[in-house]
A protein has these predicted regions:
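Extreme N-terminal starter segment of soluble prokaryotic enzymes
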Residues: 1-3
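Phosphate-binding site of ATP-dependent enzymes
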Residues: 152-182
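Structural motif
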Residues: 61-63, 142, 174
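Short, well-ordered alpha-helical microsegments
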Residues: 12-14, 129-130, 182
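Conserved N-proximal alpha/beta basic substrate-recognition cap immediately N-terminal to
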Residues: 7-119
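Glycine-rich phosphate-binding loop of ATP-grasp-fold ATP-dependent ligases
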Residues: 119-122, 140-163
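Rossmann-like NAD(P)H-binding beta-loop-alpha module
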Residues: 113-139
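Flexible loop residues that form catalytic
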Residues: 65, 125, 146
Length: 182
């Protein structure tokens, strides 16, 4: 059996499901926030009330993990770690998600590997926010929440908009050099 962790049955989930069915493989789509784990000598995952032995899982594909509290997010990642610790192959595993979901960590990894990115400055000190903006950016900079994707919460800070949406940023200010399209 293969598990597909997803928040919705989008095109990617449908394509994966069809591919598994083409090879006569059993597949279950799972909302990770509806999964539970049993940690004992007979460790299992519980999906929609059904206990599944980890020995019966051939692999798991992660297509989405919802936001939530720190505890909820950590638990969702713990489920993926749990599967891998029990020799279940997880595609788009917890380590990959941890490296890519946090813009600060991603920026640090890119920098450590000499992959060029726009100049970036991060602070949780509100006093440093405007100082950083005025010191390091001539005209405009991009202010982003450290979690999120697809441009959600992104703001251009410039002479006309000097204050970001503070509530959206949760007290961490990720400022990045604004690069014009060529």
């Amino acid at each position: 059996m293969y598990l597909i962790f997803t928040e919705d049955d989008g095109w990617h989930t449908n394509q994966l499901t069809k591919a598994f069915e083409l090879y006569n493989k059993e597949v279950a789509t799972v909302k990770i926030n509806e999964a539970s784990i049993v940690v004992n000598e007979n460790s299992k995952i519980i999906v929609e009330g059904k206990q599944i032995s980890l020995k019966d899982i051939d692999g798991a594909f992660v297509r989405g993990i919802p936001g939530g509290t720190l505890e909820e997010i950590c638990f969702h990642l713990d489920i993926l770690h749990f599967l891998e610790l029990h020799k279940v192959k997880v595609y788009n595993n917890a380590v990959c998600i941890e490296k890519s979901v946090d813009k600060v960590r991603t920026s640090c990894i890119l920098n450590a590997n000499n992959i060029p990115t726009p100049n970036t400055y991060i602070t949780s000190n509100i006093k440093d926010l405007m100082h950083l903006k005025s010191k390091f950016f001539d005209e405009s900079c991009v202010c982003k929440p450290i979690f999120g994707s697809q441009g959600k919460g992104l703001e251009i800070l410039n002479k006309n908009n000097i204050h970001p949406d503070y509530e959206n940023l949760n007290n961490v200010y990720y400022l990045q050099e604004f690069l014009e399209h060529p």
